């Protein structure tokens, strides 16, 4: 089974903060966006394993974010 999650990346002074919208406990930091993506995927994999071991329900994915542009 494949589940899609929505990642949100925020630029910080030391790189990037990555967090899943549907599962906010899955969060990480990386010095580059590529590193942050890889670390977020690793964190998600570890969280899924932990939830399964604890018999907890894995949050559903599927949210969609869209950037809305406006001229100011």
Identify what each model region corresponds to:
Residues 1-5, 12, 38-72:
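Short, charged, surface-exposed hinge/linker loops at domain edges
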Residues 8-21:
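Short aromatic-glycine-(Arg/Gly/Cys) micro-motifs in beta-strand/loop hairpins
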Residues 17, 32, 57:
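Gly/Ser/Thr-rich beta-alpha loop segments that engage phosphate groups in nucleotides
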């Amino acid at each position: 089974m494949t589940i899609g999650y929505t990642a949100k990346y925020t630029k910080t002074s030391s790189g990037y903060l990555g967090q899943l919208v549907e599962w906010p406990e899955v969060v990480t930091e990386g010095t580059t966006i590529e590193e942050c993506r890889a670390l977020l995927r690793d964190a998600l994999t570890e969280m899924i394993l932990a939830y399964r071991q604890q018999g907890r329900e894995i949050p559903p994915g599927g949210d969609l974010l869209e950037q809305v542009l406006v001229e100011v």
